[in-house]
């Protein structure tokens, strides 16, 4: 078995006959290959970010998080179809100027998302429970998705135009969510927090616990995890939306997280290249 990317190559002898668990071995082999590429970069990013953080006063750190929150809110909203421009978003969140002739729903959800993000970065980072997730959803969508905000969906959902991808059936939503949150709670450091955030993102989207708003909640989860373990936060930009969704969809179609993991880790490293 052999895998090559650029100048990097990894080989493994499996014997004269193909093992019965060949598919699992392939995944483990690929993960080993990519960990050898990612982990040194992630470690360096973490170390240099920590060193930088020690020189920044807490008041400036909070200000930096709040500034990040503006761009994070704009992009996470835009990915989901918001019509507010970046300037609209900045005017709304910095100056309190409501955009003219723009969707009231987009405006409310933008404000609520930003307020929640700022609250999170200014609060003690607690254990994430099912109630945490439901409360986040209610905070953002309480005024725009009345009757559904803060509640697990009671109907099956899929992707319009793609009947090959099915999200979690209703009876399995809560058990799978609790299993995922338990994985998060029992994190043992064997993988980096960045990879943990990616896995949580992938699994949460596959569960798809809400009728709408899953993407925004999962991207909040990603940054909550990174914040908790003192890593640089993750900004997935709207301009990269196509590649983001394509990698996620490929993993869903093949029931193999490796494709999304590759995209996510490379994207995170690229976004933090100033620390390399």
What do the PLM-derived regions correspond to, one by one?
Residues 2-212, 216-276:
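FIC/Doc superfamily catalytic core
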